[in-house]
Amino acid sequence: DFIGKSGQNSVFLRGKSGQNKVFLHGKSGQNIFNSMINRKLDNIIANHYAQQSTALLLSGARQVGKSYAIRKYGQQNYTCFVEVNFIQQPEAIQLFRNAKSVADFLLRLSTFVQQPLVKGETLIFFDEVQVCPDILTWVKFLVESGEYRYALSGSLLGLQLKDIRSIPVGYLSEVEVFPLDFEEFVRAVGVGDATIDALRNAWENHYEVDAMIHNKMLQLFDLYLIVGGMPAAVQTYLDSNDMQQVIQVQQDIIRMYRMDIAQYDVAHKLYIQNIFDLIPSELNAQNKRFILKKVDRNIKFSRSENDFVWLADAGVALPTFNVEAPCMPLLLNKQRNLFKLFQNDVGLLACQYASGIQMKILNGETDINFGAIYENLVAQELKAHGYDLYYYNSKKYGELDFLIEENGEIWAIEVKSGKSYRNHNSLSKCMFCDEFHVKRSIVLCNDNVHVEDDIMYMPIYMIMFLQRHRRMEQMIYKVDIRGL
């Protein structure tokens, strides 16, 4: 996010001459949208405003690119783009809270930004709405007026908006934003459509990938393990190729997350910070399951559950829950007190490990627990692609790294970072257990594409093609009430 002086308004106008005049927390006329990063989010935003009349709310963790995406779209597609940031401009909170009507609200807004609003040609962006949740109660009335389009964004929304007195259902569409996924990353570093399409074809039809392309993709995968998907870290890498600069950006983001913990939950901040700081070491343990007693020997899960929920709702951690059995639906088999806790970005995870791990990853050194890092990346990809996160562990059958639901089926995913990727006793046992519902098995590894004994062995980088498909079939059902 681009941060300027407190109280600085953000307005974009396109004049008749075609020249842009920009005041976006930078110098007048400065074009800040020259990034090489193109995101799937850009298309989601464009499709929303082309197809729907609702306001758009972007939620997600800090520094994942929410505000930037809205500013970019607003600058490029609207005659007038107006932004109010409730953290940088706290005086706006009381100003809008005292509004008596939609007309009064819009008059206050126009006066505040010192700019007339152009009907039908203006996008109004309210940023950092977590500190002014009452703004959401206005959304219904603003959208109903139909004069302008609206966008909202904020962090920690899962925490701050729980007590909103009136969520505008039917007037607000929410999109959760995540760090760049692996496909977005490789496109940013220069991999073209032809290569992506060839890889997708290999994924869908189980073709072996050309050896040269396969090796290059593994190198890019290793690079992604340390750069991650935070837009600022990716842009820093693209600009400099300097890993030390990338690490500095990542460290700043981690510090910001810890500051948020201290600011937004004063009572439990020490517990939450301890949980957050323990994520790397817990993932490095043999079973990767989070052990609560490492936070406090005397605390019970029932007392600390909200601390874990805080991290999940803030978007900075990805809980992956154990299930009693790999059976449909997974949600009903979920064990909420048994879980793994992954970082929201694999680059941040690598940054939290020992100094120098980045070069060890790039050099392929074997004294690193790649399993934890690989699994974190897979969790991150699955979450960004629409899947809920589950795994299975039992004394009888062993452990399945991930379970997902796809088109009414359960798929099991094993993540293997070493050469012994064919050793997966747990997967084999669960596949042929009649009590379980595992219909497809995928082993993500460093080898090329091949299928053996009904198990798909796929290169780890092909996780980028595993996207959730929500199949909507027509369901017509009518109850015969004659005779009642």
Language-model segment annotations:
Residues 36-50:
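Pre-Walker A adenine-sensing motif
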Residues 66:
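Conserved lysine of the Walker
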Residues 149-155, 176:
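Structural recognition of the conserved hydrophobic beta-strand(s) that form the central parallel beta-sheet
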Residues 161-285:
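Interdomain motor-coupling "hinge/lid" segment immediately C-terminal to the ATP-binding subdomain
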Residues 234-407:
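Accessory nucleic acid-recognition modules appended to NTPase machines
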Residues 447-484:
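Domain-level recognition of nuclease-like catalytic cores that cleave nucleotide substrates
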